[in-house]
Amino acid sequence: MAKYTEEQLYEIKEEAYTPQPDVLDAFNKMVDHVKEHAAAEFEKHKNLKWSNGDTYIDENGNERPYHHMNKRRGSRSGNKPNLRKKSTDGIKVDDDGWATLTKPKKSFGAEDGVEERNKFRESVKDIKVKPNNKNLGSSKAVDPRDAIAEKHTNTFNAFEALGDGDDSDDE
């Protein structure tokens, strides 16, 4: 299908031939009528969405639907403002213009247990835990008894069974 610009269509408009102008006028009237009908249907359905047909007469004598009284309070529908103040004491701007927030974290007794914490970390550094590899890929919880002590299992050794001929019934 050929595509034309708006200017080309306006240039061709004078040369265009409409064989039956009364048919074209009737078609345009029908299109306008359908547009009006569609707008009226939209308004009707829009009003039905918000009301069940109940109305009342207000103090000025106007008939109004009840739906405006069923709205939620304005304080519950909007976003709440952020009332926290942003502190500017920990912002450090470097020579490139980047601003970094360097705020020390607050902790209770941070200086009190530094040497105890370092001593504990040194003592725990050498402890190795053997994981239970059969459950690593699953979401199933690991049994703590398997991680603590590996259970001894009696296994069948084929080489011992073949190499030892004394147990057979050769008597």
Swiss-Prot record:
One of its GO terms (molecular function) is eukaryotic initiation factor 4E binding. Its main location: cytoplasm. Keywords: Cytoplasm, Initiation factor, Phosphoprotein, Protein biosynthesis, Protein synthesis inhibitor, Translation regulation. Residues 86-95, 115-129 have a biased composition (Basic and acidic residues). InterPro entries: Caf20. It is found in: Cytoplasm. Signal peptide: none annotated. GO terms for biological process: negative regulation of translation. Residues 49-144 are annotated as: Disordered. One of its GO terms (cellular component) is cytoplasm. It comes from the Eukaryota. Acts as an inhibitor of cap-dependent translation. Competes with eIF4G1 and EAP1 for binding to eIF4E and interferes with the formation of the eIF4F complex, inhibiting translation and stabilizing mRNA. Belongs to the CAF20 family. This is Cap-associated protein CAF20.
